[in-house]
Design a protein with these regions (language model features):
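Single conserved hydrophobic/aromatic residue that forms the stacking wall/gate
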Residues: 1-5, 9
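Metallocofactor- and cofactor-centric catalytic cores in central/energy metabolism, strongly enriched
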Residues: 11-13, 18-20, 32-66, 76
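Extended hydrophobic packing segments that form well-structured cores
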Residues: 14, 36-39, 157-265
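Short, glycine-/Ser/Thr-/acidic-enriched flexible segments
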Residues: 19-21, 72-75, 111-112, 170, ...
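Short, conserved charged micro-motifs
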Residues: 21-28
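Short, solvent-exposed amphipathic alpha-helical segments in soluble enzyme
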Residues: 29-33, 82-95, 122-123, 188-193, ...
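Generic beta-sheet signal
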Residues: 64-70, 200
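C-terminal catalytic subdomain
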Residues: 74-166
Length: 265
């Protein structure tokens, strides 16, 4: 199988090997039939919805921290890590424009321009600079972020420099280079307390055990990006149709085994 689905050679394959022809054929066909019969049961391990709906659910929830996975731009899966779509949606909402709105941590977004200014002005200063959309600007352009610098940390192996900028009720973690935030210490090192925060948005997919155990609730947002998980939304260029789930009512494919000669014979 392959996740690089936009190619005529990509499809799901059941491969069985052995030295008994009848057993190999029957095993392959039986397993393929099981995959096909259960195709509609394959789901994410957490609920999924749009980024807009994710924010609405998080704002209304009394469980904290309500963690949202911004998974379409997950750098650990191959995303650029600097797509601004989700953060832009957050900053546009009136709920987060006031200091006493729902507390939110956004982790994280690269912004070398803002980092440079924050290092010069220091903690407690007002800073304004561009963040994000350096590598991937297909869905949203750079954000001109302004706010108060509440933390600066240098020397991180991945981010190099981390700066927290507070704007309204949102704490935005800005980095020199992209970094996934997997551990509580990633936040507390920046004087942020994720356990006592209403909403935490992370650019990862499935939650690592530490964040999973911390969550009050969790949803995976089908956000745009280089690793967009909304399969039906992707603009396929090279694909053999019909293919499930793009064609949900397609007829059963040919599940007969095809024999391949042993390579050294």
């Amino acid at each position: 199988s392959s996740s690089a689905a936009s190619d005529v050679y990509k499809r799901q394959v059941v491969m069985v090997t052995g030295d008994d022809l009848e057993s190999v054929v029957s095993s392959a066909e039986n397993l393929a039939k099981q995959f096909w019969d259960n195709r509609k049961k394959f789901k994410f391990v957490a609920p999924t919805t749009t980024p807009e709906k994710s924010l609405e659910l998080a704002i209304k929830s009394d469980k904290k921290p309500f963690i949202i996975s911004d998974m379409g731009d997950n750098p650990t899966a191959g995303g650029a890590g600097d797509v601004t779509h989700t953060l832009n949606e957050i900053l546009l909402r009136n709920e987060f424009k006031v200091n006493d709105g729902p507390s939110l941590i956004y982790a994280s977004i690269p912004g070398p321009d803002l980092i440079e200014k924050a290092l010069k002005s220091g903690i407690g200063s007002f800073v304004e600079g561009n963040i994000g959309a350096i590598v991937d600007n297909r869905f949203s352009g750079p954000i001109l972020l302004s706010g108060i610098v509440t933390a600066i940390k240098t020397g991180d192996r991945d981010a190099e420099v981390e700066v927290v900028v507070k704007t309204g009720s949102v704490n935005v973690i800005v980095t020199s280079k992209r970094k996934p935030y997997h551990y509580e210490k990633d936040f507390t090192d920046l004087n942020l307390n994720p356990r006592d925060t209403d909403i935490v948005v992370v650019k990862i997919g499935y939650l690592v055990p530490e964040l999973y155990d911390m969550r009050g609730d969790w949803i995976m947002a089908l956000t745009p990006g280089g690793v967009d998980q909304d399969l039906k939304r992707l603009d396929y260029k090279r694909i053999k149709r019909p293919m499930f789930p793009l064609d949900p009512e397609m007829s059963e494919p040919n599940l007969s085994a095809r024999l391949i000669e042993i390579s050294n014979k």
